[in-house]
Amino acid sequence: MHEAASGKAYPEVPFRIDHGRVAAFREVFDQAEGVPTTYVTAAEFTVIPDIVTDPELGIDFSRVLHGSQEYEYRRPLREGEDLTIKSRIESIRSMGANAFLVLVTELVEPGGDVVCTARSTLIERAPDRSG
C-alpha cells in the first residue's frame, strides 16, 4: 500500500436510501421500522471496489482484514432520500510489516450538510514469506 495516497478523495457517487435494501437490513436486524444504523455499510460497499482497485493506492485486497468500524450520525437516515457519497483516505500508516488505512465515507444532503460519517480501518497484512 502506498502511503502517498493518504488524503486522496474519490469521485462523489449518488446514493438513494432504497426501500428494498432498507427492508432487507431491517429483517436481518429484526428492526420493525426506521433505517438501521449499519445501513451506511451499503454506501461504503458502493465505493470500496474503486478504492481497492486503485493503482495509486496499490492495496493487495487478498491480504486485507477489517480492523474497525465507526458511525457518527447527525440525524437519522430516511427511506427514499437521495444523498451523495463522499469518500477519502484519511490516513495510511505502517506498523511493522502491516499497513493500516482509515477510510472516511460521508453521506451528504443535496444542500451540502453531512448526515452521517463512517470511518473504517482496513489492515493490509504483510506478505506471506513462507513459500
Question: Whereabouts are the PLM-identified features?
Answer:
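HotDog/MaoC-like acyl-thioester-processing domains
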Residues: 1, 76-131
